[in-house]
Structures are given as structure tokens and as C-alpha cells.
A protein has these predicted regions:
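N-terminal capping/small domains of soluble enzymes
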Residues: 46-153, 157-162, 166
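Glycine-rich beta-to-alpha transition loops that act as phosphate-gripper elements at the mouths
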Residues: 73, 155-159, 224-229, 295-307
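Catalytic cores of alpha/beta
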Residues: 79-80, 167-171, 229-240, 303-320
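Glycine-rich phosphate-binding active-site loops on the catalytic face of alpha/beta enzymes
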Residues: 93-98, 185-187, 248-254, 302-303, ...
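C-terminal helical cap(s) of enzyme catalytic domains, especially alpha/beta-barrels
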Residues: 103-115, 257-271, 327-348
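Glycine/Thr-rich beta-alpha phosphate-binding loop at enzyme active sites
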Residues: 122-123, 188-203, 234-291, 295
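Alpha-helix-loop-beta-strand connector modules within alpha/beta enzyme cores
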Residues: 134-139, 143-148, 200-220, 267-295, ...
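Ferredoxin-like iron-sulfur electron-transfer modules
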Residues: 368-389
Length: 389
């Protein structure tokens, strides 16, 4: 029986095809709706803003600081084009890797959604890298993505052999469609020779960055891991090795949980945790790097509103990436965030994000110094007391 089509985008990638054809009532597939990309902006990609939302990251201009993170919403060129139509400043594809067919993603369970009082707060995924080969991206998908009008920030895999990483940089670079690279050394559920296993090892990280940087003709940024490492130390190594900018950071290595009726795990391996619940963790890591390492930063983790974007910028980020919010709410969420951000900038009278970048960092101190400050005491307003205690 042929499934009924819904107005969704039918991807060429075989493992997303079934998801793209399913009903949009399933939260996981809402990102594929063409309508959702246009839901807030009518003529997509032509939204007029009152404030100047442009930023310059690593010497490259973005029309605004919002960037589609390397994840499911950038599965292929068409998905990236939709994000561009919704107004996004930059697009990053699923991480591009080997020339040969890449292994299928694990399919022994569903992406696991965590809720609190019925409201989604996070999700665990086991997606790896792009299931399309390097040649497919080079021959077709990057050209489609370029039509987004957004800055092309291309995610590439740090291969086990740094020389292969350098060849990957050259292959993608020769398309002429790359504005920046983002080296993925941080996937939380990779094979033992790639992903976070490189990113948490300073010596391996240094070799990878030096190899990629040696052939890159555009800015070369690195997406770091928040897992099992001193991120300030790793960020320092990355800068010294030649990185032009850093993305802080990839998802949190996690476990979905156990079905107590059967005793079996919901997902039988460790995955990456994303969504609003990780934002305080990433804000800490972003602020620590911003206070200690002088390098352009891109913040990512749990971003879903204009307030989140502003917070990340006030903690030192130049661009701010999002993913899960688009998966849950559609590409129209991009335009909503940008409209709200524009209104906030206009209301506050800011002419540029340069006026607010990093302004919160000066007030961050140690627990010991907090203890020296005058204590605060609660005052009870008896007229508003509900007698709850």
C-alpha cells in the first residue's frame, strides 16, 4: 500500500524517506513540512527587519546570527534551502564524511522525547553523520543548499587519519560553495576512532586541526565536545592549532532510560541529548571558554526563542545555532525568532549585536566571592500569601 502524501518533502535519503511520508501529527516529522517553512513570513526569505541583525563571524558576513545547526533539519540541500527561505543567517549540513556509502543510522528504537509536566524539555537521538556520500553532496546537494541565500558553513568529519581530513576539506572546497568549514570532532555516539574521541584528546585534536587548516582557503572552525574533557583546555589547544572559531558545543552524551515494564532500555546504546534542558549546561561551557580563550564563538544547545539567542550573545557568542526547536516546531520557528529578535533590538535601541556581545561575562565570579557579598533576604508580602506552607 502506498502511503498518502501530505505536502511533505520527500527526501532522496532512504532512511528519512519513510519519516517524510508519515503524517505530520508525529512530532518527529514536522520538520519536513513545506508549509511550516512559510508559516510566519509569507514571502519566505524576504522578511524586512527594522534593526541591523547582521554579524561577522570569522571574517564572514551573516545576514543575522541565527544558524541552522548540523543535524536533522539540514539533512540535505532542500532542507537547507527551506531554512534559508525562513530567513536563517547560516546553514550547516549534516556532517559530510567518507566517499563510500556510509553505514545506515541505528534503527532499533525511536528518537526518545523527554517531557516534564507534559511539556517537551529534551530528546535523545542516535543519528550519526550524513547518510549521503561525499560525492552526492558535491555533485548535487551543496548546489541546492546554496539557493538558501544563507551563509554556507559546511560541517565535515574529522577522519581517523588527518590526511584524509585534509583531502575531505579540499574535495568540498573545490565546489566553490563553502564560506566556512566546521570540523566535527564531537559527535557523542561515534565509532571509537572519530567524533568526541578525537575532540576530548588534545593531541589528536591538534593534528586534525593542523591538517585541515593547512589546505583550507576559507575560515576553519571546530565544533567541540562538552563531554569528558576540560573544555577550556581543549579550546586553547584548538586555537593554538589554528582554528579560526569554535562551536560550543555538540550534544550531551546520555541514556534514554529503561522501560520498567519490560526491563529493556528504550535505546540500547548511548545517544546525544538536545533541547531546552541542556541550555544551562552549554551556557556555562560557552561562558567559561569566552572568559578564557580569545576566539570567535558560535553557541548551540537548547535554543528556541529570541531570548535564548540574546543570552548566548551576551555570554560571548557571535552566531547562535539551533536544531531541536526546528524539529519540534517547523522551519517557521526560525522566522518567529528573527521577528522577535528584531523587535527586541528595536525596542532596546541597539544598533548592532556588538553592543551586547559578552556583556554578561564581567559579572560572573566564583562561589567564594559570592559569599563575601551582602546576603539577600526574602520578604514576604502577606497580602499575596496563599498559605501554601
Amino acid at each position: 500500500m502506498t502511503p498518502k502524501k501530505t505536502g511533505a518533502i520527500i527526501f532522496s535519503v532512504r532512511c528519512s524517506r519513510a519519516a517524510a511520508r508519515t503524517t505530520q501529527k508525529h512530532w518527529k516529522t514536522r520538520i519536513y513540512s513545506t508549509e511550516s517553512a512559510r508559516g510566519f513570513c509569507g514571502q519566505t526569505g524576504k522578511v524586512a527587519f527594522m534593526a541591523n541583525l547582521s554579524v561577522n563571524y570569522c571574517g564572514v558576513n551573516y545576514r543575522n546570527p541565527l544558524v541552522l545547526a548540523s543535524a536533522t533539519p539540514g539533512w540535505d540541500g532542500e532542507a537547507m534551502r527551506l531554512a534559508g527561505e525562513a530567513g536563517i543567517g547560516g546553514v550547516i549540513p549534516k556532517t559530510i564524511g567518507p566517499k563510500q556509502d556510509w553505514a545506515d543510522h541505528p534503527r532499533n528504537g525511536r528518537m526518545f522525547l523527554h517531557r516534564y509536566n507534559g511539556k517537551p524539555i529534551g530528546q535523545v537521538n542516535m543519528e550519526l553523520f550524513s547518510t549521503m556520500t561525499r560525492d552526492v553532496w558535491i555533485d548535487r546537494e551543496l548546489e541546492i543548499a546554496k539557493k538558501s541565500g544563507a551563509t554556507m558553513h559546511i560541517s565535515i568529519l574529522a577522519m581517523p587519519d588527518p590526511d584524509d581530513t585534509a583531502r575531505l576539506v579540499e574535495d568540498i572546497q573545490n565546489t566553490g560553495m563553502v564560506d566556512l568549514f566546521e570540523l566535527n570532532v564531537s559527535c557523542p555516539m561515534p565509532a571509537s576512532t572519530v567524533g568526541m574521541h578525537i575532540g576530548k584528546n588534545p593531541s589528536l585534536l591538534k593534528r586534525q586541526i593542523e591538517a585541515g587548516k593547512s589546505v583550507a582557503k576559507v575560515p576553519f572552525t571546530v565544533k567541540l565536545t562538552p563531554n569528558d574533557c576540560d573544555l577550556v583546555e581543549v579550546a586553547t589547544v584548538a586555537k593554538e592549532a589554528g582554528a579560526d572559531g569554535l562551536t560550543i558545543s555538540n550534544s550531551i552524551r546520555s541514556f534514554a532510560g529503561v522501560d520498567i515494564e519490560t526491563g529493556h532500555p528504550y535505546l540500547r546504546s548511548y545517544g546525544g541529548y538536545t533541547g531546552p534542558a541542556i541550555r544551562p549546561i552549554i551556557m556555562r561551557k560557552l561562558s567559561e571558554v569566552a572568559r578564557n580563550v580569545d576566539i570567535p564563538l558560535s553557541g548551540v544547545g537548547g535554543v528556541g526563542s529570541y531570548r535564548d539567542v540574546v543570552e548566548y550573545i551576551m555570554l560571548g557568542a557571535t552566531t547562535v545555532q539551533l536544531c531541536t526547536a526546528v524539529m519540534w516546531n517547523g522551519y517557521g520557528q526560525i522566522t518567529k525568532i528573527l521577528k522577535d529578535l528584531d523587535a527586541w533590538m528595536d525596542q532596546k535601541g541597539y544598533k548592532s549585536f556588538d553592543e551586547i556581545r559578552g556583556i554578561a561575562l564581567k559579572d560572573i565570579t566564583t562561589v567564594e566571592k559570592l559569599a563575601e557579598m551582602p546576603p539577600l533576604f526574602a520578604e514576604i508580602d502577606a497580602d499575596k500569601c496563599t498559605g501554601c506552607g
